[in-house]
Amino acid sequence: LNMNNEKARFVWFPLLIAVAIAGGILIGRFFSAETSFGKTARYDKIESLLQCIEQQYVDTVNRNDLIENVVPKVIGELDPHSAYIPAKDLESVNEELEGSFSGIGIQFNILNDTINVVSVISGGPSEKVGILAGDRIISVNDSAFVGKNISNEKVMKNLRGPKGTTVKLEILRKTAKNPLFYEVTRGDIPVNSVDAAYMLDDKSGYIKISKFGKTTYDEFITALSKLHNQGAENFIIDLRGNSGGLMDAAINMANEFLPANRLIVYAEGKAFEREDAVSNGTGTFQKEQVVVLTDEWSASASEIFAGAIQDNDRGLIIGRRTFGKGLVQQQIPFRDGSAIRLTVARYYTPSGRCIQKEYQLGKSEDYSMDIVNRYMHGEFFNADSIKQNKELVFHTVNGREVYGGGGIMPDIFVPRDTTGVTSYFNNVANEGLLYQYAFDYTDKYRDELSTAKDVESLLSILEPNTLLNSFVQYAAQKGIRPRPVYINISRKLIVNTLQAYIARNILGEEAFYKLLLRDDETLQKARDIVNKGEGYPELPAENQVPR
């Protein structure tokens, strides 16, 4: 397949970078200095207040501390996604979407107050010097790095750093009698967003996307090409749990499936003139069946992609209603290195739907409870429980009715699967024991497990009964008493989860999803639909537009 890697040329936010983040859709991450805060012709009550306090208040106070306390409160009176980002946090907040960062190239966890190397990134700095999965880091730059004060934030702060700088590590390894010492030169570490891409059968390919970052589109094209070369004629794109990221990644992805001159998304606001993103016709996969999987945590850029596919009648959305996050934000820097992300517009799907759900100014706590309320109302389990405003009706290009009011409603609803979920399973899952046991098991039997080169050979080692009985004993030692009836009900779920975690430790993310999703009802529904050739929406007889 001759893949077209040239990114689509869109009529879209000229000179600005469009980004979807946890706070909504962000534009202008590197906004010009002229827009930063500085001079103002208006009377500034806050500035006058600060001067008054500095000059006349009985005690000495720190002006910067006062400002750092006041600004978040002001922003908190706006919508739930406008945000203030202190200077100390801005770099790490931006880093998630950059596609890479400078570090040593390991994945780690903290168990028993110790940093455990879960995996070493192939080709990364740590692999080059000989660090292995299962190693324990006990000191960094000659300073002890164990104990209850160790946190993920502290580890990342010390292991990450400018490219080309070095960090000294002291390592414990089970096969070594004495500690090992390494000096690692930091390098660029990719932040991958396509977690898995594999064939479900002879004709259907599956792609799991966890976020939308700077490299997502290129990763997506690579995944599509790989699956197409393996015979894929249908594509199932899993956006469940994907809270968003870079908007242009979602736009370019949608462009791959759409003919020319199709609206993908547009944005508009009070002081923000409407801007459209339109497909350019260079997409390579304009005819194949496409199904998009969504759930209540699919948000922002995920909703842009799903909305473009749905409103253009290009494919089906299967799963549950999405989050409903559709605010466009502009990042405006302060001179001290901090910034605000201010909502300036809303984005709309091609049919004109605003995906943003309702909110009240200054009521972020109520807003954050929406997911809980949806759960309690039964929306995750019954399509009839979903609240839809029938007055906000819109139409796809071929005349199908779709509704606004918040989120993307799936074409085919699949309830949350509760098969095998018991109080025992919830207890061991909430305590993190499934993950911890899988790591300990991997560490104990790493040599034997490492002989497995694929999922099938790994499963031949992981005998279900032995694994389950061993885990129940482990959980009992951690304070979760055995409950035979519930354990039997949750048996398959526990074993599948343990095998998936162990597979991740040995074979990586793709193996993890292959095992975790073996019995996934939403994925199975999508697979059945495309295998029957029913991956296109049922269209009204009149006013059909050619795909």
Residue ranges of predicted features:
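Hydrophobic membrane-insertion alpha-helices, especially the h-region
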Residues: W12-R29
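Residue-level recognition of conserved beta-strand edge/terminus positions
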Residues: V140-N141, L172, E358, G405
